């Protein structure tokens, strides 16, 4: 019976408040035997398939998180450049379809330029590199992932490697010549 090392989607704050999401790959009997242990550490435990499926699911998660932060950064810089208060935009959007857990966690950090690490840019670069490698190995096309990986690499090269990944806003601030 085999259970792969489960992957966890979290940042420092989610680990502190116990809302870690575990994505597990391995055989079902072993998963059933050990899932309660994982529930003691997190709020969500999902068997995603056989050995390796948990890791692949984590890579998919990281693509979505990075893409969400990128989209939020672009949208909020657009609003700011157009003269709309970012806090008003956040209040207006967060309850609708575009609202998300990522937006709720990261926009206040962006508005306050608080890039104290929850999940570091350098760790996200590693995950996106792994996602690109996985995509290439299975023949998946992931152009957005390539773009966001380049943005994160820019952040690393410009001193934000140890910052929270919400520092993506710095890239857009530089391009737009405006602070959020």
Language-model-derived ranges and their functions:
Residues 1-13:
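Single conserved hydrophobic/aromatic residue that forms the stacking wall/gate
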Residues 5, 68, 124:
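Short, conserved glycine- and acidic-residue-centered signature motifs
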Residues 14-19, 40-64, 107-114, 144-146:
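Conserved Rossmann-fold dehydrogenase catalytic segment
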Residues 23-57, 65-100, 134:
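Internal alpha-helical scaffold of NAD(P)-dependent oxidoreductase catalytic cores
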Residues 51, 55, 99-101, 105-165:
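Interdomain hinge/lid region at the active-site interface
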Residues 78, 92-96, 147-154, 171:
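Short acidic/histidine-centered micro-motifs embedded in hydrophobic/aromatic stretches
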Residues 80, 136, 156, 170, ...:
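Short polybasic/polar patches that bind polyanions
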Residues 164-180:
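Short, basic/aromatic-enriched C-terminal tail that caps enzymatic domains
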């Amino acid at each position: 019976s085999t259970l792969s090392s489960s992957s966890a989607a979290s940042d420092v704050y989610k680990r502190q408040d116990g809302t870690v999401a575990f994505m597990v790959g391995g055989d079902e009997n072993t998963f059933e035997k050990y899932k309660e242990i994982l529930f003691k550490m997190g709020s969500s435990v999902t068997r995603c398939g056989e050995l390796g499926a948990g890791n692949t699911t984590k890579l998919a998660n990281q693509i979505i998180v990075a893409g969400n932060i990128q989209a939020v950064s672009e949208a909020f810089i657009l609003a700011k450049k157009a003269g709309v208060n970012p806090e008003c935009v956040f209040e207006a959007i967060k309850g609708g379809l575009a609202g998300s857990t990522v937006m709720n966690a990261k926009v206040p950090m962006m508005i306050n330029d608080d890039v104290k690490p929850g999940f570091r840019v350098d760790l996200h670069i590693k995950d996106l590199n792994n996602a690109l490698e996985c995509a290439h190995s299975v023949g998946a096309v992931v152009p957005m992932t390539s773009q966001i990986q380049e943005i994160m690499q820019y952040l690393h090269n410009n001193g934000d490697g140890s910052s929270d990944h919400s520092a993506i806003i710095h890239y857009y601030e530089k391009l737009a010549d405006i602070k959020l």
